Amino acid sequence: MRIRRNSSLDLGRFSDPSLLILSSLASGPKHGYAMIQDIEQFCGTHLEVGTLYGALARLEKQGWIEALALVERRRPYQLTQLGITVLREQLATMNQVVSTGQQRLATI
């Protein structure tokens, strides 16, 4: 997995391209390049093309996203209902991790 970050605070394997893609698609259908731009804008992470399309294939196979009809030679994707549920659950878990981490950091 190749992800380039604009920050020296690189979490490496703690960063999940699937979560970034699902979060990007939460604002509506997008094609690959639009997702790369959106993800870079909202979190400063640049997904490499190979990483993006590998993750898209896995997400589609899991039924979390679906491909739409081509638009000007570009294939947009959108979240499925299952994908929305998965994203909500993952974000709730992340919120709990953030809350716990912040509480624990406050004690040191």
Per-segment meaning from a language model:
Residues M1-R4:
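Long, low-complexity, charged/polar intrinsically disordered regions in eukaryotic proteins
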Residues S8-T51, V71:
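N-terminal helix-turn-helix DNA-binding core of bacterial DNA-binding proteins
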Residues S24-S27, L68, V86, Q90-T93:
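Histidine kinase transmitter module recognition
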Residues L52-G54, R58-L59:
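Basic amphipathic alpha-helical segments that dock to polyanions
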Residues E60-V71, Q78:
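Beta-hairpin "wing" of winged helix-turn-helix
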Residues E72-L91:
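Basic, amphipathic "hinge/linker" alpha-helix immediately C-terminal to the N-terminal HTH DNA-binding motif
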Residues R88-I108:
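Amphipathic alpha-helical dimerization/coiled-coil segments
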